[in-house]
Amino acid sequence: MMSSMESPEVRVLVFGLVTTAIGGAFAWLWITSLRVVYARAWPRGLRTAAWAFVALWALTSLGRVAARALSAPDVLYGPLTVTSTGTLLVVLLTTPLLVGARLLLRWLEARDRARLVERAAADVEPASREPSPEARVEAPASPARASTEVTHEASGFTRRALALGVVRSAPLAGVSAATFGLGEGMTDAVLNEVEMQFPGLPPALEGLRILQYSDVHLGQFIDLREIERLARLGEAAKPDLVVLTGDVADDLDLLPDALGLFAGIRPRLGTFASIGNHEYFRGLHKARRAYERGPVPLLMESGTVIPVGDARLHLAGADDPRFLGLQSRGFFESTVDKALDGGPSDAFHVLLSHRPEGFDAARTRGLELTLAGHTHGAQVGFAERSVLEPLMPDRYLWGPYQQGGSRLYTSSGTGHWMPFRIGCPREIVVLTLRRGPIDAPAVKRRLRLRA
């Protein structure tokens, strides 16, 4: 029997309350930082507007949690989600800037105090060296020194004014970034082709095209009409095989219809799926039932062998750990072993792992190709890579990767549960297999096809 904490509704409620509490901490830090940064320029109107903004976020966030827990219609849940997400993004984007501004202002104040102390010490001379009144003669001020002091004062004032101007523009910058990110997040998904070369690719698999959808998150921001458009766009790429690498739906009531639309692409080698963490989060039993009754097989710690001419393609699917922790490495090694169990050693192996961390276990076992998602590329990218790539080089956040003779592609996601993206568009990926040297870089290009 399912315990109360295993209920999807309870998990959604707990998750919503936890994220609201974290957001509340950021909101408090945001308000206090605004007060410090604006100091005397903190009029009642600005103070009222800031608190009203935080109140709007709090009310819509709690309302969204309640609406989800009570299964409220989308006509109510949608506006609450958009408003709470937009306001939270402004807070999250501006808080680091404002905290940095607080530190900068403290440094400026400490520097000014130190300079005042130095000047006071320089103006006080020892009494023993003080000349008699008769001998004291006022020397004219040096024009050069006077000019230098004025220049220093003006320079300090200019730097301070510039610094204050920059930090006080943080809220406007945050609103602009949030607006731009929300706008880009609501744009259509793009279709990218990625060519990868493998030295041992069987001739029968030369030019094989695998169409990958990942992290569609059907529900609040992605509806069935969008799924239909995505399926048509993918069909225009003429794939041989279609794979869904987890997090297909947040609203599991819509999952059967979505699977029917993806299966309607009718690739010659079929359509297959792997599990994601949101299937667990929303209700694994319900998700598995949809797959069992639908046209798309779910590969969950299992695999299938697909004959392609005189070659064989072994397609395997890993499980998802739900949460990453100290035991995650062992989990991925175990789930990949189970997925590969019984697979022919002479086949070309493709692993579907919702999380790209499964690639480390796959490459140590000699798998040629792993397809993953989950990260959404952090939803902010530059030059086809996540902006967090330098900080997390071993997390495989977005794009093609290679380790030894194994390759990985991590999708930026076909959908999202939060419609915010900058330089990291939603994508459908067509992976084309080529025979060639393993050290040849993957080639990625945009396909201009119409759905």
PLM regions: where:
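Non-catalytic terminal accessory segments
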Residues: M1-M186, K444, R450-A451
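Soluble catalytic domains of enzymes that build or remodel membrane lipids, polysaccharides, and related
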Residues: V190-E193, Q197-R450
